[in-house]
Amino acid sequence: MHSDELLVEILVEELPAQALLNEYKEMPKKLHALFNKRALEVGKIEIFYTPRRLCLLVKDFPLLTQETKEEFFGPPVKIACNHQDKTQGLNELGLGFYQKLGLKDHQHFQTAFKNNNEVLYHAKIHAKEPTKDLIMPIVLEFLEGLNFGKSMRWGNVEKSFIRPIHNICVLFNGENFNDIEVKEYGFKTKQATKAHRQEGFDFIQVDSPKAYFEVLEKNHVILDPKKRKAKILQEIKELETKHRIIVEIDRDLLDEVVAITEYPSALLGEFDKAFLKLPNEIIITSMKENQRYFAAFNQKSQESPTLHNGFIVVSNAISKDKQKIIAGNQKVLKARLSDAVFFYENDLKKPLDNAPLESVVFVQGLGTLKDKMEREAIIAQYLTQKYASSLNMPLEKALELVGRAVRIAKADLLSEVVYEFSELQGIMGYYYALKQNENELVALSVKEQYLPASENAPLPSSVFSAIVALSLKLDSLFSLFSVGKIPSGSKDPFALRRLSFGLLKIVVHYGLEFDLKADLKNLFEKVGVYQSFDLEVLEKFLLERFNNLIDCNPSIIRSVLNTNERGIVKIIQKVKALKRFLDDPKNAQKKELLFSAFKRLANINKDRNPNESSEFFISLFKESQEHALFEAFNAIKTSTFESLDSKIEAYFGLHAPLEEYFKSVLVMDKDIEIQKNRKNFLWGVYQSFLEIGDIKEIAI
């Protein structure tokens, strides 16, 4: 037998769920790296976790290391020997090389060639060694390499970790790993594990991976998080069927309860129906954030199920008295929801107009929330006038309602409910607005101002809401860029990348053309209070988001962005049209020929000043191919196309006259006047192509 199964359990105090979940994804990669570092070829690696333990299971862990050769290259022979022919032995430099390696016999030194130089050389062969001596150092290095964000020290231990470590159990090939002193964390190892807390606190001896799994199973520990998740979902499904409810499975919450349980049980509790007068979002958020409960809905109405006065709690207890567990959770939730009622009713007493926005700083150097609201109002007015035809209401009415929406949009940030649950910003503003008899469009736009919340999240439901959402996003971009709060690398504290992506998605979804040069400049000047900064930096930042906006060959996107087109909607339309054309198999030959011809066209003009005159004269054309290309080109220039697709088809149709032109016409004619005329003509053709895209950028 050359290998065996290796199991390592790190027994700890309860690990914080979110930190564990974040780092768990990186653990297999980090363990692999440690094995590779020592040239250990192993089989499948599995890492399991519960709140109290990390378990590393490695299949086919070798019993012996591989024989390895370590090479050492010294100074060049010509300066390390007493004579260049090497017959006179080593000088002081050469002797020093071997002495550093701990070698005394230099009589028969070796040489090798490195970078075309003959140098002193020594190879050290490392014989195979038992891997059992490597296991603990690997485990300790693994623990030290984990990044949970925060760590702590306990007792007089040398190292810190996210929570105190109580034991490391190593099971491998029947070897003895008991009583190994781990000074770093202040304990001696035991080949033992512990049961579920309610089963006892004593160590249970184990002597093999098989015995380890059997002990945990008998003692109410489900080690595999996938199995714990499956158990929870199965029990929730049974409760849904039994009680005719629909449980909203929040995937993040599910992962969290899996991470805080060793033997989960899903139980159904209830709360007083009187609490259902609260907005659903308050109840659901309170249950999720404070208690990690899942919300339940009535099954009667499939289209729009109503919130049920029940909740799912996932318990880690193994008590048979489930009702006692349920009663305890119901008592806690009652207190939480009573607080929520108090906050909500207090908020309803405060008019939205009276919210003291001037008392809250937006960002240092950018004024208060009132200042932000006033800037957004100017932007919203500009956008309302720009998109008036898409609003289905008179402009005067639209300006009034949009202005009102922006005026009250930030009021809920000062409410007691949002102070308690910040993720309800906008949502609570919607409910408060309706309760205070605001227009429904206004109220809904307050709710939707922060949308989309993520890449695939819903967008604002109307152009009206879109204008309010765009105003918020544009002001945040202008403001933060003006004071240098520009994302760099992985740092994006104000989530401006997500915000920008949302801006683009809204504009494209509703076809609200927005020019990243002209409109940005107009708004910057119209608001008039932003600190001066280079608007091209913001323009470039927004353009960089296009690669995530559409599933497409990035070079096609780049070809359109490399032109003067800065209308967001037009950019996307051109990218999609080019993609359709290039993806069509019947255009394969045509595009290959045009790419070849266009690259020649681009090369001829690569050093040209864009502002240089491109005037040319047909009277100076000497070859029939010049006239043929001009006629084909002129036909396109003077045509009106029904669609971008037909325009692209026409431009790509120039591949034939372009190919003939380059076969028969010498652009760099000896006659300077003719040469200049030809270059000017081709420059005009090249510039015209930029109406659809810079074809030289496309890589298919």
From Swiss-Prot:
Q: Where in the cell is it found?
A: Cytoplasm
Q: Name one Pfam family in it.
A: tRNA_synt_2f
GO molecular function terms noted in the UniProt entry: ATP binding; glycine-tRNA ligase activity
| EC id | 6.1.1.14
Query: Domain of life of the organism in this record?
Result: Bacteria
Name the residues that span the membrane.
Answer: none
Q: Does the keyword Magnesium apply?
A: no
Which Gene Ontology BP annotations are present? glycyl-tRNA aminoacylation
| Enzymatic class | ligase
Q: Give yes or no: UniProt keyword ATP-binding.
A: yes
- Quote the cellular component terms of the Gene Ontology held in the record: cytosol
Its keywords, alphabetically, are: Aminoacyl-tRNA synthetase, ATP-binding, Cytoplasm, Ligase, Nucleotide-binding, Protein biosynthesis
Instruction: Identify the stretch annotated as signal peptide in this record.
Output: none
- Which reaction equations make up its catalytic activity? tRNA(Gly) + glycine + ATP = glycyl-tRNA(Gly) + AMP + diphosphate
Q: Which HAMAP family match?
A: Gly_tRNA_synth_beta
Similarity remark: Belongs to the class-II aminoacyl-tRNA synthetase family.
Assembly and interactions?
Tetramer of two alpha and two beta subunits.
Its protein name is Glycine--tRNA ligase beta subunit
Q: What organism, scientifically named, is this protein from?
A: Helicobacter pylori (strain Shi470)
Name the encoding gene, please.
glyS
